[in-house]
Amino acid sequence: MSVVVVGGNDRMATRYKEICKSYGCKAKVFTQMPANFDNKIGTPDLAILFTSTVSHKMAMRVNQKAEKHRFPVARVHSSSVN
């Protein structure tokens, strides 16, 4: 299963990947908006959107891509791992 994590804290990016790996998932983590963001997202099985730490522009792009390619988006307010 492939997961895209959007938002969160820069320092927690490797922790997010470790958690996904422990559940047998391959993860991409985007804490900031890179160039060609739409292409880098790809078509994952799930997108996790940390709403408290993500920019409006990134959230809109993820939602548009999810609607187009029909993958679910889990919206979580907190970016904590507890």
Where are these regions (language model features)?
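Short, charged N-terminal beta->alpha structural module
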Residues: 1-24
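Cofactor-binding loop segments of dinucleotide-utilizing enzymes, especially the Rossmann-like FAD-
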Residues: 6-8, 32, 78
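A short acidic, amphipathic alpha-helical/loop segment
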Residues: 16-19, 39-40, 61-62
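A short, well-structured beta->alpha microelement
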Residues: 23-40
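An anion/phosphate-binding loop that grips the pyrophosphate of nucleotide cofactors and donors
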Residues: 44
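Short glycine-/small-residue-rich Rossmann-like dinucleotide-binding loops
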Residues: 52-53
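Ser/Thr/Gly-rich flexible loops in soluble cytosolic domains mediating phosphotransfer, phosphorylation
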Residues: 66-82
